[in-house]
Amino acid sequence: MSSSAGNQVRASHILIKHQGSRRKASWKDPEGQIIRNTTRDSAVSQLKALRDDILSGKAKFDDLAARYSDCSSAKRGGDLGPFGRNQMQKPFEEATFALKVGEMSDIVDTDSGVHIIKRTG
């Protein structure tokens, strides 16, 4: 049985972890030195600047994800692959399912940190 289009999405994201993140380490900061010293406000400011660069055409989403995201998906340009309901944290899932393909979210907060999400499928 194939899943209908409404049950699965595909997305890429850029995650910036901060002091309030559940896990204060990442592939690019294994000891969490930077993350422990990053406030949520500064993480949001960084993400907003990246989002502005993408929207203005100055940079590509996948290039910025590869460079700045604290998620290991950075190695794939932020691509998380396809996922369905109840597979991601609720705020992340709701934001992704609300986007149209090709659209990018505003800032989304989860226990992992702050994200911008681009729905790709």
Swiss-Prot record:
The keyword Ubl conjugation does not apply. Signal peptide: none annotated. Inhibited in vitro by juglone. GO terms for cellular component: cytosol; nucleus. Keywords: Isomerase, Rotamase. Its EC number is 5.2.1.8. Residues 1-10 have a biased composition (Polar residues). Residues 15-25 have a biased composition (Basic residues). Pfam families: Rotamase (PF00639). Residues 1-32 are annotated as: Disordered. It catalyses: [protein]-peptidylproline (omega=180) = [protein]-peptidylproline (omega=0). Residues 6-121 form the PpiC domain. Gene3D superfamilies: 3.10.50.40. The keyword Isomerase applies. PANTHER family: PEPTIDYL-PROLYL CIS-TRANS ISOMERASE, PEPTIDYL-PROLYL CIS-TRANS ISOMERASE PIN1. Belongs to the PpiC/parvulin rotamase family. Like all plant Pin1-type PPIases, do not contain the N-terminal WW domain found in other eukaryotic parvulins, but contains a four-amino acid insertion next to the phospho-specific recognition site of the active site. These extra amino acids may be important for mediating the substrate interaction of plant enzymes. This is Peptidyl-prolyl cis-trans isomerase Pin1.
